[in-house]
Amino acid sequence: MQVESTLFSHPKYWAECFGTAPFLPMSRKEMEKLGWDSCDIIIVTGDAYVDHPSFGMAVIGRMLEAQGYRVGIIAQPDWSSKDAFMQLGRPNLFFGVTAGNMDSMINRYTADRRIRSDDAYTPGDVGGKRPDRAVTVYTQRCKEAFKDVPVIIGGIEASLRRIAHYDYWSDKVRRSVIFDAKADILMYGNAERPLAEVARRLAAGEAIADIQDVRGTAVIRKEPMPEWRGMDSRKIDQLHKIDPIPNPYGADDVGCANLSGPSDAKIFDNDAPKPISVQPPRPKPWDKTYVLLPAFEKVSEDKYLYAHASRILHQEQNPGCARALFQPHGDRGVWVNPPAWPLNTDEMDAVFDLPYKRVPHPAYGKEKIPAYDMIKTSINIMRGCFGGCSFCSITEHEGRIIQSRSQESIIKEIKDIQDKVPGFTGVISDLGGPTANMYRLGCTSEKAEKTCRRLSCVYPSICGHLGTDHKHTIDLYRAARAVPGIKKILIASGVRYDLAIEDPAYVKELVQHHVGGYLKIAPEHTEEGPLSKMMKPGMGAYDKFKELFDKFSKEAGKEQFLIPYFISAHPGTTDEDMLNLALWLKERKFKLDQVQNFYPSPMANATTIYHTELNSLKNVKHTSEVVPVPKKGRQRRLHKALLRYHDPAGWPIIREGLIAMGREDLIGNSPNHLVPPEGRNERGPKWMKDANQGQKALTRFSGNQFDERKGKGDAKGKPSASKPKGPKSGANAPQSQQPKTSRPGAKAPFGQSGFKGKAEQGKAGQNKAGHQGRAGKASSGRQQAK
């Protein structure tokens, strides 16, 4: 999508005369050293301040600084009073509030709603340094400190709560966060462009209440914007115009007298002069058009209307054709403008070339910040994801259009890391983004790109308009390897294997030069039921990628392994589906550690399915498919235990589940059994203590699994990143089995009320190759959540 470069093209604010700050100030003392008497803009964030382009406050702060503004940072303030929010004084223009790179609720709670004791974005990995629903709390404190100062909220937390949304932690539908926070403007997505425009207009003296038409923003209004045409979508199966359709030629003087037609004299008067007239272009169906969504009060009570509203929102994410949205909340409503135009390559380069120090603020001393340690030698080469995985919110935050940096800018950053990162060893830990292999990929049809409303460019099959040539990525990898002093370039971002197999040359380049012993990919499941609700491909694509991976590893003389990621308890998953996945894992001797139950994050399509138990991936009707959803704690524990079938802590609940499914034949001591029978001492105090602890998680996978493939079941340790032990991935791997799970008298899904009905026939190994999107998790630290 061709976008004009406007981000840095406007005249700078007068305060540019103060120059560039070594670090954006966090105290009055730092401000005084810079010669500042005040800040123009103050950013309040739930993360520690790290001056690095993977941290949102740094990107936004440096971008605004480049526009000439004096920007201060209040990081992880004490929210118990307004005092910490006054430490930099009153900002001249506005407060910018963000929860940080992660949603504060996901940051503070596990998928089982248990509070976390750690926080990777806090010095010392200490938990509890940010409040629940940080955007709301911080905004209220800013308003308390300086009532008349505008507050603009943004980042991943605000972005994914821009309309009424299901909240997993309170198990109810909540209002748009702009109402709870009482903010003046909400910005969604990567907000450089809308934030620069709003700052410029505020600096010019425009009132915050008058700035309501900026793309990529949401505001509170009593009614829709004037002169916008409305589409009423408050009911299912009903869509009609709210206002009369305007004359497409712009004429406003067509009355009844003019509709009778011209006289015969005018028709046959061929000698009469005919002036040439130029008609205005016919407006597009989405130009100045909004969709009226069901009200908050309605979607809170009616799950069909909630699914319907969610479906509309996800179809209005293409900047080229998106319509505005208006959702009533009582006597007011939230007006969501169309998404901001994506940054072009020049603008992306300019943002990432800003003068970042690439280290934490000196105020933290020598304290470790785990999130920084993880990404300090990684490089973000792009934004966006067109995969559309239903459990992921990156598409709703960053968009489907891939925004790529130039190769020159990326190589410059590699050299910057060499100069600025203390203790750099010559290894770049990642060249990636939400997905590793979408760099400079996109739609080959400009018209299709501007008008498409598909949820995914690769599901259920790869779109014919999508370019799949990885030439630019291959060229980038080679150029990066050629930088003097660089020993290794690793690819740690998730690889879209269904996309990669379209270009075997890319797979070869990746496998032979950029895999540090094992490569992480995410099939997420093996069964069609959950895969169809995840919008993920069948295992045929995984098998084909694995075949290429093994082939190219062998050609390079390397022993390398694929590390598959899986999700348990995802909407659409039955107990039988999880059993078949467990059997697939056991057959291949995979032993997973640190497995993840499905986590319903706000605005994700899968979260809508979780809440409504309806298939919102298709048009919502009163006859929409009802989806099985593992919600009960016991059933979710069973699904998680099946992923770790090898852990004695889960054997009791697995046995109960197998009996409920009529699969007692899988309980025994032979290699063909899933779990052993209950032992004599199993319920003793010592065993229960050990079982509750589970097996120690060395990596995402058990340390001895690779040695077991050689028959060394007692071997210890994890595979080395540079030279893992064990055979080549997939050596002598048996074909997917097809276990029988249907037998007379089999019981209902485990964890539901009562045991009745029949178990479904197993489907392991029956999935066909498909094409589906792979997006990183919404909580990913790589995400540019500003």
Curated annotation (Swiss-Prot):
Asked whether the keyword Metal-binding is assigned, the reply is yes
- Coiled coil where? none
Low complexity bias locations:
718-731
How does the cofactor attach, per the note? Binds 1 [4Fe-4S] cluster. The cluster is coordinated with 3 cysteines and an exchangeable S-adenosyl-L-methionine.
Q: Where is the composition biased (Basic and acidic residues)?
A: 679-688, 706-717
> Polar residues bias located where?
732-741
Region feature Disordered, mapped onto this chain: 669-688, 698-786
Radical SAM core domain boundaries: 371-649
What keywords tag this UniProt record?
A: 4Fe-4S, Iron, Iron-sulfur, Metal-binding, S-adenosyl-L-methionine
The cross-references to InterPro entries, in alphabetical order and at most eight, read: Elp3/MiaA/NifB-like_rSAM, Methylthiotransferase_CS, rSAM, rSAM_horseshoe, UPF0313, UPF0313_C, UPF0313_N
Name a GO molecular-function annotation: iron ion binding
Please list the residues that bind [4Fe-4S] cluster. C385, C389, C392
Q: Which cofactors, by name?
A: [4Fe-4S] cluster
HAMAP family (UniProt xref): UPF0313
What the record says about family reads: Belongs to the UPF0313 family.
Could you tell me what this protein is called? UPF0313 protein SO_0311
